[in-house]
Design a protein with these regions (language model features):
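N-terminal signal peptide c-region/cleavage motif recognized by signal peptidases
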Residues: 11-13
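Noncatalytic, solvent-exposed loop/strand surfaces
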Residues: 15-471
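Sec-dependent signal peptide recognition
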Residues: 1-7
Length: 471
């Protein structure tokens, strides 16, 4: 029996770990063995497993692969064997409702998180669930309904002995921690400033002390104690919509945010104060602005975001929030990590190391790899920057490709992998020059971020999961 256990442990370890959205602490980086640059249906393919649709990314833990999907309108967590891709089990989650979603979102967008023994999944149409590695349900926690204009897309993470979930929405945003073992709520803290974001947090481990949970929000980023949810550290100065995952490299944290093109520096427009708006547009003199009263066509297109209560009118606090939203600037911001309470004045300038504000992505998160920042925007413009100084190394579309990107870049074995919506996975040599090694077409759409573990590259398309490696 002892020999069997050792073999099983080694077998699980051999497949490596990529146990949450974007892998080790959300960095998108693997210290994996050799990875192929060229791959496809007839090259470097270890296996292909057809799967129902879903936008969640594959994760790998304990020799198992986990992801979520929707099949015949039902919500499922899938477990695959890492070695051959065989489906080990699938478990259905209740579907209490159908949340409204942006066309690029999906009911199975959130990525699971796992340790060697258990997996934790989140479906916005139900809540949180946990299963053993063999598919036995351990607990479930109904949550919602939610009110995010895009639909909820954030993924859970593990911190110490809790599962953490950030729910940023149009109203009543919060961060929640539940016990890994029993699914009971340990703490829940409001995030009153947070709007419709989708940024999955990262964890700062502190030996002998509770970990910090680093979670971007509208206009700011907070570090919460995993023990009780106390806000310990924070900086201000971020955009209003945060969807990317922050990346910690050394003592710096990198995070990008994009709201609208009108939040780019130089494209912002002057907006009237509340009193000026009332004087101009409040024709019925009721102290509010009805949609039909609003005369500015540019502002009217954002009506659904401004009318946060959904009552068909704008009131003073909603307009002031809109002014703050439109005053914030898109950008990649790099901050120095701090000690507890050292930003109590709320002044981010003392912590800001550098920022960059051109071709900023809305959805893809960045990668910091071998002292270079790789920032890929939704339209396929790749920016490489010196990680220490922010000096621009190169900004260009990937050579010969004109693609949209919703998946985030990942890195390993001296290579950068970029998976486009149309199903082309470009492979670049690591470095600021953006040297293209190969462009591999899978002929299937991709929304999910690839995973790297144990010398294998896992790519999920809308219809299958591929495993590529050196043969």
């Amino acid at each position: 029996m002892r020999i069997v256990c050792v073999v099983l442990l080694l077998s699980g370890a051999a497949w490596g770990q990529w146990d949450r959205f974007r892998g080790p602490n959300g960095t998108g980086v693997s210290e994996s063995a050799a990875l192929p640059a060229e791959f496809g249906a007839g090259k470097s393919l270890i296996w292909r497993q057809p799967l129902p649709a879903g936008h969640s990314s594959p994760i790998i833990a304990g020799g198992r692969i986990y992801l979520t999907a929707v099949e015949d309108g039902r919500l499922y967590t899938f477990c695959l064997e890492a070695g051959g891709g065989r489906i080990q089990w699938k478990q259905e989650a209740p579907r209490s409702r159908r949340e409204k979603l942006h066309t690029l979102n999906h009911p199975a967008s959130p990525t699971p998180v796992a340790d060697d023994d258990n997996v934790y999944t989140f479906f916005p149409d139900f809540g949180l669930l946990s299963y053993t590695r063999d598919g036995k349900e351990r607990w479930r926690l109904p949550l919602g309904p939610f009110n995010n204009v895009y639909g909820i897309g954030v993924s859970p993470v593990l911190a110490d002995d809790v599962v953490v979930l950030v729910i940023d929405q149009d109203r009543n945003s919060f961060i929640l921690a539940v016990g890994r073992g029993d699914g009971k709520v340990r703490w829940q803290k409001p995030r009153p400033e947070a709007l419709s974001g989708a940024s999955t947090p990262v964890v700062i481990e502190r030996p002998g002390e509770p970990s910090w949970i680093l979670a971007p929000s509208s206009f700011r980023m907070d570090a919460y104690s995993a023990r009780d949810g106390e806000a310990i550290w924070w900086v201000h100065g971020l955009p209003s919509e945060m969807k990317s995952v922050p990346v910690i490299a050394g003592d710096l944290v990198y995070v990008s945010g994009f709201n609208t093109p009108e939040n780019d520096p130089g494209r912002q427009v002057a907006l009237p104060t509340w009193q000026e708006l009332l004087a101009r547009d409040d024709s019925n003199k009721d102290g509010a602005i009805q949609q039909e009263e609003l005369s500015d066509a540019r502002t009217k297109k954002y009506w659904g975001f401004i009318d946060t209560r959904g009552r068909g009118k704008i009131e003073e606090d909603e307009w002031k929030l809109h002014l703050s939203v439109m005053a914030a600037e898109n950008g990649l911001y790099t901050f120095q990590l701090g000690s507890p309470g050292d930003a109590t004045a709320g002044d981010a300038t003392a912590k800001l190391v550098w920022k960059y504000q051109r071709a900023v992505p809305q959805l893809p998160s960045l990668v910091v790899y071998r002292d270079v920042v790789y920032m890929l925007n939704d339209r396929g413009v790749l920016t490489t920057l010196d990680a220490a100084t922010g000096r621009l190394l190169r900004q260009d579309r990937v050579r010969g490709l004109s693609e949209n990107y919703y998946a985030s870049p990942v890195a390993g074995d001296g290579k950068i992998f970029l998976a486009s919506h149309s199903g082309v996975v470009a492979v670049l040599r690591a470095g600021g020059e953006q040297e293209l090694l190969a462009a591999n077409s899978l002929d299937e759409e991709i929304f999910a971020t690839p995973a790297i573990a144990g010398g294998r590259l896992y790519v999920r398309t809308v219809s299958a999961l591929y495993c590529f490696g050196m043969l």
